[in-house]
From Swiss-Prot:
Entry GO terms, CC: cytosolic large ribosomal subunit
Keyword Ribosomal protein among record annotations: yes
Subunit note: Part of the 50S ribosomal subunit. Contacts protein L32.
Gene Ontology molecular-function annotations: structural constituent of ribosome
SUPFAM superfamilies named among the record's database cross-references: Prokaryotic ribosomal protein L17
Name of this chain's protein: Large ribosomal subunit protein bL17
Pfam name, any one: Ribosomal_L17
Keyword field contains Repeat: no
GO biological process, one term: translation
InterPro entries recorded: Ribosomal_bL17, Ribosomal_bL17_CS, Ribosomal_bL17_sf
Amino acid sequence: MSYRKLGRTSSQRKALLRDLTTSLIVNGSITTTEPRAKEVRKTMDQMITLAKKGDLASRRKAAAFVRNVVADVKEDGDDIKIQSALQNLFEDIAPKYADRNGGYTRILKTMPRRGDGAKMVILELV
């Protein structure tokens, strides 16, 4: 199994990937370094594939990985509906890619980071 170590221990790397994947689900795009984006792309494709299945086991696997954060708050008169990142993944993102087999994300290269010259990219959902 090959993966990028990203200069971190395994627990730190897993936490980083969980955070970046959750941010991508909530915001639709993130700005990060190129190696991180390439790793997040793998996990995001896995999460969308699980969401497309839509069964209980897939939902539980995704819930074990995606952070429990608020993705959207909708007000409808007196009712306030709070949507989590997991609900956003299963209800909004997965139906959008129902007829697509992989390749759910796009990497756009931007200018290098000013401080250390690291290659920066924008990772977004297609």
